[in-house]
C-alpha cells in the first residue's frame, strides 16, 4: 500500500520590515512535493541578502494558526518533535524533517525577523 504524503509549501514569501533600507525577498523551494511516510524531507529558504540567523520556520495546517517550529535558524521550539531541525545562516537556510509522519502534512513557511519571534 502506497502511503504517500503530499506536503504543500509556500513558493515565495515577501516580507517587509520598516526599519530596513530595502525589502528582503525570501524564496522557498521546492514549491510543492510528494513524499512517503518515513522519508527525509528538506525544504530550503534563501534570503536576497544576509539576515544572520534571524529566521523562523512555521507549520500551518488547514483552518489552524501557524505554529512556530524553529527560531534563530536552528533552535527547536519547545514541544516540537525532534524529527524537525533547522540549519543555515546568512542567506541559505534549511528545514529538515528526518522521518516524515502523516501528521506533518501542512504548509511550511520561513520568515525573517529582526529580533526573537
Swiss-Prot record:
The keyword Membrane applies. Its main location: secreted. It is found in: Secreted; Cell membrane. Residues 57-71 are annotated as: Framework-2. Residues 23-45 are annotated as: Framework-1. It comes from the Eukaryota. Residues 1-22 form the signal peptide. Disulfide bonds join 45-110. GO terms for cellular component: extracellular region; immunoglobulin complex; plasma membrane. GO terms for biological process: adaptive immune response; immune response. Residues 23-117 form the Ig-like domain. Keywords: Adaptive immunity, Cell membrane, Disulfide bond, Immunity, Immunoglobulin, Immunoglobulin domain, Membrane, Secreted, Signal. InterPro entries: Ig-like_dom (IPR007110), Ig-like_dom_sf (IPR036179), Ig-like_fold (IPR013783), Ig_sub (IPR003599), Ig_V-set (IPR013106), IgV_Light_Chain (IPR050150). Immunoglobulins are composed of two identical heavy chains and two identical light chains; disulfide-linked. V region of the variable domain of immunoglobulin light chains that participates in the antigen recognition. Immunoglobulins, also known as antibodies, are membrane-bound or secreted glycoproteins produced by B lymphocytes. In the recognition phase of humoral immunity, the membrane-bound immunoglobulins serve as receptors which, upon binding of a specific antigen, trigger the clonal expansion and differentiation of B lymphocytes into immunoglobulins-secreting plasma cells. This is Immunoglobulin kappa variable 1-27. It comes from Homo sapiens (Human).
